[in-house]
From Swiss-Prot:
Keywords for the protein's UniProt record, in alphabetical order: ATP synthesis, Cell membrane, CF(0), Hydrogen ion transport, Ion transport, Lipid-binding, Membrane, Transmembrane, Transmembrane helix, Transport
GO MF term set: lipid binding; proton-transporting ATP synthase activity, rotational mechanism
Family indicated by similarity: Belongs to the ATPase C chain family.
Function: F(1)F(0) ATP synthase produces ATP from ADP in the presence of a proton or sodium gradient. F-type ATPases consist of two structural domains, F(1) containing the extramembraneous catalytic core and F(0) containing the membrane proton channel, linked together by a central stalk and a peripheral stalk. During catalysis, ATP synthesis in the catalytic domain of F(1) is coupled via a rotary mechanism of the central stalk subunits to proton translocation.
InterPro entries: ATP_synth_csu_bac/chlpt, ATP_synth_F0_csu, ATP_synth_F0_csu_DDCD_BS, ATP_synth_F0_csu_sf, ATPase_proteolipid_c-like_dom, F/V-ATP_Csub_sf
Main location: membrane
Name of this protein: ATP synthase subunit c
Gene name of the record: atpE
Membrane-protein topology: Multi-pass membrane protein
Localization of this protein: Cell membrane
UniProt organism field: Bifidobacterium adolescentis (strain ATCC 15703 / DSM 20083 / NCTC 11814 / E194a)
GO cellular component, one term: plasma membrane
Length: 75
C-alpha cells in the first residue's frame, strides 16, 4: 500500500468515528427528554424543576459529544 491509500483509509476511519461520536449522545438526548416529559406528565407541579435538571443534563451530554469531535481533530 502506498502512502496516499493509507491516508484515504485513515480519513474514512475518522468519518466513521464522527458518526459513532454522534450516535451515543443522540440516543442519550432522546432518553433524557422523553423521561423529562414522562416525569412532568406524572407530576406537573415538578415541571420547572425537571426542566432545569434536563437542561443541565443536556449540557453534559453535549459536552461529551463535542469532546468526541474535538479529539478526532486533535489526532
Amino acid at each position: 500500500m502506498d502512502i496516499v491509500t493509507l491516508a484515504e483509509v485513515a480519513g474514512n476511519l475518522n468519518v466513521v468515528g464522527y458518526g459513532l461520536a454522534a450516535i451515543g449522545p443522540g440516543i442519550g438526548l432522546g432518553i433524557l427528554i422523553g423521561k423529562t416529559i414522562e416525569g412532568t406528565a406524572r407530576q406537573p407541579e415538578l415541571g420547572s424543576r425537571l426542566q432545569t435538571l434536563m437542561f443541565l443534563g443536556l449540557a453534559f451530554v453535549e459536552v461529551l459529544a463535542l469532546l468526541g469531535f474535538v479529539l478526532a481533530f486533535i489526532k
